[in-house]
């Protein structure tokens, strides 16, 4: 999105594939200091304190967004550790209402394109609560044939790489599998989401050393 848009992750629904007309709704807001856009402070405007992961669709009425972010929509964001979260929602519903979400949890504060609008995010389920000793990178998501969401991410401890981890969340928002190390050497592909096929999650990526590309898989129980 451009600098003049709301600071948020936005979900768009294509209404007409022929001309790509779509309806867009903000689903997860970013904090910026009040008046940052008026001051034309592009550093503050573009510092989202978040990173997009991906969206997976389990059914026509059940989809999930996975990303990382700081928890607060206030100046606390400057000092908070970014955590992994999921929002499971009905893509056809009004995402500005709590009834659109399967998962529960709200966060409120100041957002908008200038940091001066009161905003509330719904359905935010935090999947991690790491201290600043740990950091998360490349959050990703795919969905199984059973409709369970497999969340993958890279974890670091004091900037030292620990590996790829997986969390499984069912369609109702329950954690079916807590964070489990999948590989100590694999990295995730930041350019493409993993895919699910024949009981496994598949992705291509690198290892800790070298430039070769490898095919990785993780058997989902």
Residue ranges, per PLM feature:
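Extracellular, repeat-based ectodomains that mediate carbohydrate processing or recognition
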Residues: 1-221
């Amino acid at each position: 999105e451009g600098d003049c848009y709301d600071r948020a992750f936005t979900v768009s629904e294509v209404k007409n594939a022929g001309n790509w007309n779509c309806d867009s709704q903000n689903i997860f807001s970013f904090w910026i200091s009040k008046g940052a856009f008026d001051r034309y402070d592009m550093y503050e405007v573009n510092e989202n304190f978040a990173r997009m992961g991906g969206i997976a669709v389990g059914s026509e009425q059940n989809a999930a967004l996975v990303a990382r972010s700081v928890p607060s929509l206030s100046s606390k964001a400057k000092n908070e550790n970014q955590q992994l979260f999921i929002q499971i929602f009905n893509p056809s519903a009004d995402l500005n209402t709590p009834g659109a979400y399967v998962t529960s949890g709200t966060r409120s504060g100041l957002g908008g394109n200038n940091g001066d609008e009161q905003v509330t995010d719904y359905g935010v389920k935090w999947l991690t609560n790491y201290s600043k000793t740990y950091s998360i990178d490349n959050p990703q998501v795919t969905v199984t044939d059973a409709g369970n969401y497999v969340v993958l991410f890279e974890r670091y401890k004091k900037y030292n790489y620990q590996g790829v981890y997986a969390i499984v969340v069912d369609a109702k928002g329950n954690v079916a599998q807590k964070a489990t190390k999948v590989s100590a050497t694999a990295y995730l592909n930041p350019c493409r989401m993993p895919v699910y096929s024949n009981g496994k999650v598949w992705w291509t990526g690198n290892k800790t050393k070298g430039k070769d590309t490898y095919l990785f898989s993780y058997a989902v129980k």
